[in-house]
Amino acid sequence: LWRYGWEKERVRPIGWYDEHGPRATMQVSPDGDYTQTGIRWNSQGYTSPTHKQYIEAPARSGLYYLHAKGESGAFFSFPWIVAPKEPSAAVAVLAANINWNAYNNFGGRSNYIHADGFVPTPTVNARYELKRYTDKRHLLFSEPDYPPLSFDRPEPLNFIPENDRITDPIEGRSACHVAPAEWRTVGWLEREGYAYDLYAETQLDSGVLDLDQYKVLIISAHPEYWSAKMYYRLKEWVFERGGKLMYLGGNGLNCEVEFLDEYTMKVKNGDQGGGFSHLQKIGKESRFDLCHESEAKLLGVTCSETGIMTGAPYRALKADHWVFAGTGLKDGDIFGENCLHMRCPGGASGHETDKMTVSSPAGCELLAKGLNPDDGGAEIVYHCTDSGGEVFAVGSISYPSALPVDDAISRITANVLNRFLG
């Protein structure tokens, strides 16, 4: 068991998992669509109490990883979100476990592959069989309803190599927008000396996380999928009770999910395509807007397709704002060139980017904009509420991957957090 902060800290060994019977601990894929029901690996064959092994959560909240290594030397790692028994800091951070589940295709389905259910015959060659790759007119979300997705599945997309350090480039397709990227956020907090409590997003929905026990909430990287309960709890906290929100990511709060039980969710994608350009045609800005309202009413920004899958630095537009104090930046200066995000290299504005819309709150200030193609740069915005609440949003999935290595990004983020902490 390891704790992932600014450094990887070995907590303790867990021991060997083995049994007398030949291949008794070999896992098998159950029959049926376990993307809906869960893989239930522990439901068979652990009848005796002596067969069971438990791990007690560490007392200190944080992002933990379990390291597993077989006799062959093959290595695998997976995250464990450890929330506090009681609030212990002024800052709460959410790990985006709902988003992890939406993108997890273990078992053959995710919210992006066979989102509307399995086809009658298994896919053999995705590029030749899935409309995602064969039909340029294909709309990602075109059905009125979508089968559930279970949290009870392994998450290979959150794997972090054994020898990776927090300042190493984030390689691969998935790692740069899920737990490995979020590690850069909590690691940066520790490097800068900020205490924090880490929670799973689902704990905001369940009520385990009480926002009123904290001054600041941080969400980062790619918190795309939220329940309506989560959204309105956060909005009420910011607009009515003076809560401070730091949105250090992109394409956030973009689509509603519903929890059927503790382990299962349904995504409310709608049947209008899902993209900003599709939804604009019917006067909507996001899938969340289809069911409720635009997330820009809270965040100040919402995601659009321009700039997608590119990376670029930001340009300062209002350098005399307190956000830029101590950076030495002037209007027109470029910052955020250094970034660990290797899927869309080029800078802290990237991967998927958010911009202001007509739904942004009155008084929302545009402080900087990314230099991505097609005017697709992420927009850094700030707004405050009558209750004393404040929101700082960076509009970019790539942003947290710049925190450990870009001085200006680090200083700007610290300026905001220091002000929000008072």
Residue ranges and their predicted role:
Residues E224, A228-L329:
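A glycine-rich, often tryptophan-bearing local segment used as a flexible ligand/cofactor-contacting loop or short
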Residues G62-K69:
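Short, aromatic- and glycine-rich surface loops/edge beta-strands on solvent-exposed regions
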Residues E56, K284-D386:
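Catalytic beta-strand/loop cores that center a nucleophilic Ser/Cys/Thr
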Residues Y4, P13-W16, D33, Q44-P49, ...:
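Intrinsic-disorder/low-complexity accessory segments
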Residues W16-E19, A24-Y46, H51-R60, S174-L260, ...:
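Helical hinge/lid and interdomain linker segments adjacent to catalytic or ligand-binding clefts
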Residues Y54-P58, W80-K85, C384:
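Extracellular and analogous surface-interaction loops
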Residues E192, S206-M230, K235, L248, ...:
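Catalytic-domain carbohydrate-binding cleft regions of carbohydrate-active enzymes
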Residues W2-R40, S72-L211:
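Aromatic-Pro/Gly-enriched surface loop or interdomain linker
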